[in-house]
């Protein structure tokens, strides 16, 4: 059975977030502000249906999807690009591949111990974030 990612999660650490944002083409001022933020994730999981909210004082982002079903994702509030996304389970990792203007883009969420891990990747840049349950 896949992992249960449900809960409210607070950011503990972030590695190479600026490199990831640079690969997305996010402007200098936004990158500098975003690096200072400590976003909170709220994940609602009902079987293979997910709602993931990422909330910060700068921007909020909401995505809803069902595992195994391709969907159009509007990354308004992030890099303002649209892409076609497909989320699948790879063992206990929830993995998303995003096809669009940027190459080799996507993310993975998984739990180790009492922490939620997020790895975001785009055009060779990888950002690793760790969250603690609130």
Swiss-Prot record:
The UniProt record lists the keyword Transport: yes
Membrane-spanning segments: none
Keyword tags: Cytoplasm, Retinol-binding, Transport, Vitamin A
Chief localisation class: cytoplasm
InterPro entries: Calycin, Fatty_acid-bd, ILBP, Lipocln_cytosolic_FA-bd_dom
Record GO terms (molecular function): retinal binding; retinoid binding; retinol binding
Alphabetical list of Gene3D superfamilies matching this protein: 2.40.128.20
The organism's place on the tree of life at top rank: Eukaryota
Tissue-specificity statement: Highly expressed in white adipose tissue and mammary gland.
Cellular component, GO, one term: cytoplasm
Subcellular location: Cytoplasm
Domain notes: Forms a beta-barrel structure that accommodates hydrophobic ligands in its interior.
Family of the protein in this entry: Belongs to the calycin superfamily. Fatty-acid binding protein (FABP) family.
Function: Intracellular transport of retinol.
Full protein name: Retinoid-binding protein 7
Source organism: Mus musculus (Mouse)
The gene coding this protein: Rbp7
């Amino acid at each position: 059975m896949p992992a249960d990612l449900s809960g409210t999660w607070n950011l503990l650490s972030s590695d190479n977030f600026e490199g990831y944002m640079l690969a997305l083409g996010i402007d200098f001022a936004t990158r500098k502000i975003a690096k200072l933020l400590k976003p909170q994730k709220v994940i609602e999981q009902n079987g293979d249906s997910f709602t993931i909210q990422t909330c910060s004082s700068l921007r909020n982002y909401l995505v809803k999807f069902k595992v195994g079903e391709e969907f159009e994702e509007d990354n308004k509030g992030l890099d303002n690009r649209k892409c076609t996304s497909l989320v699948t389970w790879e063992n206990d990792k929830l993995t998303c591949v995003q096809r669009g203007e940027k190459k080799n883009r996507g993310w993975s969420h998984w739990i180790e111990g009492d922490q939620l891990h997020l790895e975001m990747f785009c055009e060779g840049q990888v950002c690793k974030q760790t969250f603690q349950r609130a």
